[in-house]
Amino acid sequence: MSQTKTLKVRVALLCILVGIVLALVAVVTDHWAVLSPHVEHHNSTCEAAHFGLWRICTKRIFVGDKERSCGPITLPGEKNCSYFRHFNPGESSEIFEVTTQKEYSISAAAIAIFSLGFIIVGTLCALLSFRKKRDYLLRPASMFYIFAGLCLSVSAEVMRQSVQRMVDSEHTAWIAHSLAWSFICACVAAALLLVGGLALLLLALPRMPRDPWESCMDAEPEH
């Protein structure tokens, strides 16, 4: 592999590395979405919430005279967090009482796990490719990174639809929502994994001959 090509491969791997870090941050944090209830009484407290793939946190926030909504979530208040019990039927947070909503949440978490699995396998292939004459391992590594980006983008879209469906439901007290920084990290990570994986795949593929005679001319003469 030439020095120019090696430099391009390193740039692609750096892009993928940033995507991996953002993907891990998105999966382990709980700021995918922020939910706000309807404010009926001023000079009282309201309960806002933010959640991720595994945990939901509610916070009691004081509402002033001029406030029309509950929040922002960064205001000080009494905080209470609980983990989702995705795989235990009949045990879920009160906010996820609707069966369809719980299915959405389980799907997003499961797809995110697949994404992390693809990242781990792709990273192993990339590390093994650094050994001499093992550049061919960059091809499966790039494919695994592309699959990870696709899974993460699907997980983000499922979560977005999940939140929208919950807010639109008649069985919930939440009337407003906003996608938070963990969701943005997931979207950026998916884009970096897709772009970096595709670039790495193109760099790892063998060079096609410019004309039909090139491969014959480059062949070693028979003795």
From Swiss-Prot:
In the UniProt record, which is one GO cellular component term? sarcolemma
Keyword Nucleotide-binding, does the record have it? no
Question: What post-translational events are described?
Answer: N-glycosylated.
Sites where a glycan is attached: N43, N80
Subcellular location per the Swiss-Prot or TrEMBL entry: Cell membrane, Sarcolemma
Q: Which residues lie on this side of the membrane: Cytoplasmic?
A: 1-10, 131-135, 206-223
Which terms does the UniProt entry file under GO BP? establishment of localization in cell; regulation of calcium ion transmembrane transport via high voltage-gated calcium channel; sarcoplasmic reticulum calcium ion transport
Bilayer-crossing regions: 11-29, 110-130, 136-156, 181-205
Q: Which UniProt keywords apply?
A: Calcium, Calcium channel, Calcium transport, Cell membrane, Disulfide bond, Glycoprotein, Ion channel, Ion transport, Membrane, Transmembrane, Transmembrane helix, Transport, Voltage-gated channel
Membrane topology term reads: Multi-pass membrane protein
GO-annotated molecular function: calcium channel regulator activity; voltage-gated calcium channel activity
Q: List the disulfide bonds.
A: C57-C81
Instruction: Provide Extracellular-side residue ranges.
Output: 30-109, 157-180
Matching Pfam families = Claudin_2
Q: Which family does it belong to?
A: Belongs to the PMP-22/EMP/MP20 family. CACNG subfamily.
Query: Subunit structure, per the record?
Result: Component of a calcium channel complex consisting of a pore-forming alpha subunit (CACNA1S) and the ancillary subunits CACNB1 or CACNB2, CACNG1 and CACNA2D1. The channel complex contains alpha, beta, gamma and delta subunits in a 1:1:1:1 ratio, i.e. it contains either CACNB1 or CACNB2.
Biological function: Regulatory subunit of the voltage-gated calcium channel that gives rise to L-type calcium currents in skeletal muscle. Regulates channel inactivation kinetics.
Q: What is this protein called?
A: Voltage-dependent calcium channel gamma-1 subunit
